[in-house]
Swiss-Prot record:
Name of one Pfam family that matches: RNase_H
Keyword Magnesium among UniProt keywords: yes
One GO-annotated biological process of the protein: DNA replication, removal of RNA primer
Signal peptide: none
Subcellular location: Cytoplasm
Protein name: Ribonuclease H
Function per UniProt: Endonuclease that specifically degrades the RNA of RNA-DNA hybrids.
Subunit note: Monomer.
Organism encoding this protein: Erwinia tasmaniensis (strain DSM 17950 / CFBP 7177 / CIP 109463 / NCPPB 4357 / Et1/99)
Length: 155
C-alpha cells in the first residue's frame, strides 16, 4: 500500500517577471516538511511549478499524493494540456514552443512514480496551508538567493 502524502504549494513573484519564490508543505501522518526558496528573476507561473516539483522530488518512494495548488496554470497544464504538448513535440496548438518547457518536463518526470490527485484551492481565501505556503513564497521572493537558470524573457 502506498504512503498517503499531502502536498500544499504556492508561488509568488514581485513584478512578474521579477524576484520570486515558492513555498511548499509536505505532510505524511504527523510529519511535516517545509520547502521554500527565492529566485532573483523569474515569473509567478515558474514559482508555482517549482513548489510542486521540489516537494515531489523530495519523495523517496512511490506515494499516493494529494497535491493542493491555487494555480490553474499548473493544475490545467499537468492534467489537460501536457498530453497534447508531448504529442506535438512540446509545441502549442499554434505550433509555438511551450512556455516553461524545462519545468513541465521536470514536473512530468517527478509525477511518474506517484499516484497523484490534483486539488485546486482558491488562493487568499483562508485555506490554512495555502496561506502558509503563500507566506513562505512571499518571504522567499523578498530575499532571493538563487538564479532561475531556465527563465527566459519569452517564458
Amino acid at each position: 500500500m502506498l504512503k498517503q502524502v499531502e502536498i500544499f504549494t504556492d508561488g509568488s513573484c514581485l513584478g512578474n517577471p521579477g524576484p520570486g519564490g515558492y513555498g511548499a508543505i509536505m505532510r505524511y501522518g504527523k510529519h511535516e516538511k517545509i520547502f521554500s526558496a527565492g529566485f532573483r528573476l523569474t515569473t509567478n507561473n515558474r514559482m508555482e511549478m517549482m513548489a510542486a516539483i521540489v516537494a515531489l522530488e523530495a519523495l523517496t518512494q512511490p506515494c499516493a499524493v494529494v497535491l493542493s495548488t491555487d494555480s490553474q496554470y499548473v493544475r490545467q497544464g499537468i492534467t489537460s494540456w501536457i498530453h497534447n504538448w508531448k504529442k506535438r513535440g512540446w509545441k502549442t496548438t499554434d505550433k509555438k514552443p511551450v512556455k516553461n518547457v524545462d519545468l513541465w518536463k521536470r514536473l512530468d518526470a517527478a509525477l511518474s512514480h506517484h499516484d497523484i490527485t490534483w486539488k485546486w484551492v482558491k488562493g487568499h481565501a483562508g485555506h490554512v496551508e495555502n496561506e502558509r505556503c503563500d507566506e513562505l513564497a512571499r518571504n522567499a521572493a523578498g530575499n532571493p538567493t538563487l538564479d532561475d537558470v531556465g527563465y527566459t524573457s519569452e517564458a
